[in-house]
């Protein structure tokens, strides 16, 4: 399975977000990871 950093839904292998707008507790960090995943 995917390993995601606690407090985020996008930082790590894959993501655990239900949709693109869901970020988790650490929103600024997750936003950066989400943008990077889209590269």
UniProtKB/Swiss-Prot annotation:
Binds 1 Ca(2+) ion per subunit. This is Phospholipase A2. Keywords: Calcium, Disulfide bond, Hydrolase, Lipid degradation, Lipid metabolism, Metal-binding, Nematocyst, Secreted, Toxin. GO terms for molecular function: metal ion binding; phospholipase A2 activity; toxin activity. One of its GO terms (cellular component) is nematocyst. Ca(2+) binds at residues 10, 12, 14, 37. SUPFAM superfamilies: Phospholipase A2, PLA2 (SSF48619).
């Amino acid at each position: 399975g995917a390993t995601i950093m606690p407090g985020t839904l996008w930082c790590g292998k894959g993501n655990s977000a239900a949709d693109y707008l869901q970020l988790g507790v650490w929103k600024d960090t997750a936003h950066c990871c989400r943008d990077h995943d889209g590269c």
